[in-house]
Amino acid sequence: MSVKQKSALQDLVDFAKWHVWTRVRPSSRARLAYELFADDHEATTEGAYINLGYWKPGCAGLEEANQELANQLAEAAGISEGDEVLDVGFGLGAQDFFWLETRKPARIVGVDLTPSHVRIASERAERENVQDRLQFKEGSATDLPFGAETFDRVTSLESALHYEPRTDFFKGAFEVLKPGGVLAIGDIIPLDLREPGSDGPPKLAPQRSGSLSGGIPVENWVPRETYAKQLREAGFVDVEVKSVRDNVMEPWLDYWLRKLQDESFKKSVSRLFYSQVKRSLTSDSGMKGELPALDFVIASARKPGA
């Protein structure tokens, strides 16, 4: 098959993928997008992260930013030597390999709905001969397949926004944590757009169809105060929901706008994927337009006891 024929066939396949994606309900789009465009997502990532990253001054690139985001979450969770850790919605599992090396937990179990994520992460664990301490399974964040009081820490890095609903995940995490265990989440929520010091209810931007916010179940579209309240209602104490958006949102967008100018990146992904990423990042109707209304938080909460 010629390169031209192969390109035409790939475009046809990609169009079919996009046709399917646009016709599922918004809350299912995130999972389907990760599965349909798995090869493209692998090509866009450095170090197999699928995250926005935490960008400190002088940060050299996306992998460094993503490792720092993983480090921030591990700090919030208090992951330490000997811990049993559950990572929910693990993506390609990059943070789990990072934590295994830097935090020395006894074991990390990852749960994700996307079969390709489970396969890719499991194959890497086998290649690196750590499958006894790092295990990846298919499963639902809102129906965790584990017994009560199994884990010391539960984490979710930039995936809980898609859980339907996220409050069921809070309840499940509380159940599987040991007394004294900690839940830590890196999450995207709407920003309260009120002027500082203003009274009254939070002012939230409306969700947009076909964008990041359009893929968030409506019941998850809550500000920080409500997020913290929902954690307390699930039984947690010592709840903290901290905004880190200044180190996440705009630096990530700046990185990707530069990436779009890189010819080697353009050649590494399908034309449809490139065009959709470009449209999202440069259009006011996409990520560029909605980032000012979104917050990125790191939340932590402890189960009473111990």
Swiss-Prot record:
Keywords: Antibiotic biosynthesis, Methyltransferase, S-adenosyl-L-methionine, Transferase. Disruption phenotype: Cells accumulate erythromycin C and its precursor erythromycin D, with little or no production of erythromycin A or erythromycin B. One of its GO terms (biological process) is antibiotic biosynthetic process. Pfam families: Methyltransf_25. Its EC number is 2.1.1.254. GO terms for molecular function: erythromycin 3''-o-methyltransferase activity; S-adenosylmethionine-dependent methyltransferase activity. It catalyses: erythromycin C + S-adenosyl-L-methionine = erythromycin A + S-adenosyl-L-homocysteine + H(+); erythromycin D + S-adenosyl-L-methionine = erythromycin B + S-adenosyl-L-homocysteine + H(+). S-adenosyl-L-methionine binds at residues 157, 162. Pathway: Antibiotic biosynthesis; erythromycin biosynthesis. Belongs to the methyltransferase superfamily. This is Erythromycin 3''-O-methyltransferase. It comes from Saccharopolyspora erythraea (strain ATCC 11635 / DSM 40517 / JCM 4748 / NBRC 13426 / NCIMB 8594 / NRRL 2338). The gene is eryG.
